[in-house]
Amino acid sequence: MLAALFEPIRIVFAFFESLVVTIGFLFVGGGQFVAPGDYLTQLNRTGIFDNRAQDAIPQTQVHDIVLEFFEGDHGGRSPKCLLIGYDGARADALINTKDDPNAGTQLLKADGGAIYNMYTGGSPRFINRQDTSTAPGWMTMVTGKWANEKDGTGHGVNNNDPSKPADGPKVIFTELLEKQLARKTHYIVSWNKHFNGENATYVNDIKYCADNNLAAAWTDTDSDKETFGLTLAEVMDPDGADMVMCILEYCDSAGHGNTFSNTEPKYVQAIKDSERDAAALIAAVKARENYENEDWLIIITADHGGVFTGHGPQFAGCRQIFLAANKKVLGGVLESTLPPIVD
């Protein structure tokens, strides 16, 4: 009842925020603000993406892609997934690595996959709005829901402050384990707000998995170096988790500390560092002793972009992100890249 009463207020607020954004595009210079249409055109001209920026896929589809993959036919192979997150990586950040064949995203494309324009922040903006921030972005990916959904099934994490309610939609890790599609899952992060504290984003998911004896591991570290190392060890372990997700903070840290811009050397280096770590993880997957008998879905994506030294509003530079995968997944339809099994 209260939600229904406050809904018109939220829509009006979102409208005025959008108006402020538009005014900012018109009056603020310096290259950080670009009119939405111009920014999308710039993304299209990069030659990086397999879909138009105007046709960006919603962030919600990541969950559906992963679930569909595990539920699909793997030709007798064991399904496994590695999801690598670049926190705070704008879509146009990939300009800095598009000519590097050893960059993580380029390796996935070379394996028969693709790189897609994707968006965060809710759709449509006035109805399903959520901050273009860390907690809402990743939560949308692992639940397949925006924070606010008309039917009341949203995950409720509008910004970085709240926990997902205990009665909210289940995260992909829980779903895979309960459906017996995965034996073990492991979620590894460098930002402790995900898992630590009374208001941790996933506190109720962690409790649910523990109460129900589900083999879900949740690990936070003190640095991206440690997150990378733990993820590498998990991927190299013959008995490691079937679903592994890690989040690297290089880009977000560089953006907040300097600026979210390709003219900022530290931000450029951050995307290169992310791509380097991703490439090493991809190599580790392919080096697994049982790799030929496994079917791996590997995804690299981001939770949000940024402008100046922040994010959260509905700026195009904050909303437009990307999804790279070793399989073509546009529209949530997986195209297998598996070679036939040779006896």
Per-range role (PLM):
Residues 136-144, 313-343:
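Substrate-binding rim/cap in mid-to-C-terminal beta-strand-loop elements of soluble/periplasmic
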Residues 77-82, 111-116, 179-186, 238-246, ...:
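Loop/turn elements at helix/coil->beta-strand transitions in domains of secreted/extracellular proteins
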Residues 37-78, 90-180:
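Active-site nucleophile/metal-coordination loop of metallo-enzymes that catalyze phosphate/sulfate
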Residues 148-220:
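Catalytic-site neighborhoods of secreted/periplasmic enzymes
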Residues 87-92, 122-126, 131-133, 146-148, ...:
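Solvent-exposed loop/turn segments at secondary-structure junctions
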Residues 81-83, 91, 101-109, 273-315, ...:
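Metal-dependent active-site segment of extracytoplasmic phospho-/sulfohydrolases and closely related
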Residues 1-36:
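Membrane- and interface-active hydrophobic/amphipathic segments that mediate membrane binding, fusion
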Residues 195-206, 232-280:
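Active-site His/acidic residue clusters
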